[in-house]
Swiss-Prot record:
This is Orotate phosphoribosyltransferase. Its EC number is 2.4.2.10. It comes from Rhizobium leguminosarum bv. trifolii. GO terms for biological process: 'de novo' UMP biosynthetic process; pyrimidine nucleobase biosynthetic process. Pfam families: Pribosyltran. Catalyzes the transfer of a ribosyl phosphate group from 5-phosphoribose 1-diphosphate to orotate, leading to the formation of orotidine monophosphate (OMP). Residues 192-211 have a biased composition (Low complexity).
């Protein structure tokens, strides 16, 4: 099913934030910060994998992802969709179905037996591959998958994360010659004090003391 509607970016970001709060995927713990895949400790964590358990939300988020890519990257820019082990795999399958494209998945490392493959599926050399992850902070884990696809002969100029922390990683993607697309950032989930009131905003403010805002205000991370 090819997605052909193009909602406003701000609307998509606001709705994804609302969905994440609705399914209780936004977590805060200043006393015991969460360790992210990037290795950094964060008082805030978002569990995008929970999106998979809610069919209406899952379908809507995939519509948003398809809209974002078609509008910002183009209609004929990809030959296949790659999901990174493990969270990116189901989202890659869903997005590939939306865009009518083949799907592959990339292991964190070769499996160590059989063909010792790191990439599973059919990816002809020279294929233009979009790498998808559920979320990214500094881009480290996504670039492990991007590097593996490139080493196998694929071309990766674009990546997409459903959720981007929006604090770190911009330079990493620029240096790696990858354009990162995303639907929402922490700026959407954690609105500014002057933003208009909504149920999401009120719940967010109730759960997010000043330490969260201080963390989100940091400029960047050295990868």
């Amino acid at each position: 099913m090819i997605q052909t509607t193009f909602p406003d970016r701000a609307v998509m970001a606001e709705l994804l934030a609302k969905m994440l709060w609705e399914i209780k995927a936004v977590h805060f713990n200043a006393a015991q910060p969460y360790k992210l895949a990037s290795g950094m400790a964060s008082p805030v964590y978002i569990d995008c994998r929970k999106l998979l358990s809610f069919p209406r939300i899952r379908s809507t988020v995939m519509d948003f992802a398809a809209s974002t890519l078609l509008r910002d990257a183009g209609f004929e820019q990809f030959d296949c969709i790659a999901g990174g082990e493990t969270a990116g795999i189901p989202f890659a399958a869903l997005l590939a179905d939306r865009l009518g494209l083949p799907m592959i998945y990339v292991r964190k490392q070769p499996k160590g037996h059989g063909r010792n493959a790191q990439i599973e599926g059919n990816m002809p050399e020279g294929s233009r591959v979009l790498v998808i992850e559920d979320l990214t902070t500094a881009g480290g884990s996504m670039f492990k998958f991007i590097d593996a696809v490139r080493a196998a002969g694929g071309i990766v100029d674009h990546g997409i994360a459903l959720f981007f922390y929006g604090i770190f990683g911009e330079q990493r993607f620029a240096d790696g010659k990858v354009r990162l697309h995303h639907i929402a950032t922490w700026r959407n989930v954690l609105p500014s004090p002057g933003s208009r009131s909504s149920s999401t905003t009120r719940r967010c403010r109730k759960s997010s003391p000043s330490s969260m805002r201080r963390w989100l205000g940091r400029e960047r991370m050295v990868a």
